[in-house]
From Swiss-Prot:
Family assignment from sequence similarity: Belongs to the MoaC family.
Name recorded for this polypeptide: Cyclic pyranopterin monophosphate synthase
Active site: 125
PANTHER family reported for this sequence: CYCLIC PYRANOPTERIN MONOPHOSPHATE SYNTHASE, MOLYBDOPTERIN COFACTOR SYNTHESIS PROTEIN A
EC number: 4.6.1.17
Species for this entry: Pseudomonas fluorescens (strain SBW25)
Highest taxon in the source lineage: Bacteria
Amino acid sequence: MLTHLDSQGRAHMVDVTDKSVTFREAVAEARVRMLPETLKMIVDGAHPKGDVFAVARIAGIQAAKKTSDLIPLCHPLMLTGVKVELSADGADSVHIVARCKLSGQTGVEMEALTAASVAALTIYDMCKAVDRGMTIESIRLLEKLGGKSGHFKADQA
């Protein structure tokens, strides 16, 4: 059942008024593949635009907080924690992991996915002048905790 459609098939924001407040957490990931030279420049802190990981981390955090402005039927949430981690993965990619949490009436999957996506887009934006062939890959939900549907873990789905 698609919860964002009413009985006439029209889109609407789901009413969560009667749902219980529970702890909710979601973890999402993304990956940016690039030339090894581009990754080395980032890791060595030699990028002319500055600290790529720091800017991408802040962009991801800000994006999580703005998710309801970007995704029309998402509820505005009072996030209590957002963490975005970036790391070099092998010789040619950056791995991004975003974690969002709150105590609330609806989940934070979209916030975690948005954080990971925007962090990846920020890396692309900052590095496109030196590497136009970068690819953003594997944006996915890794884990979801809390709420009526319970625990989801990607490797166990």
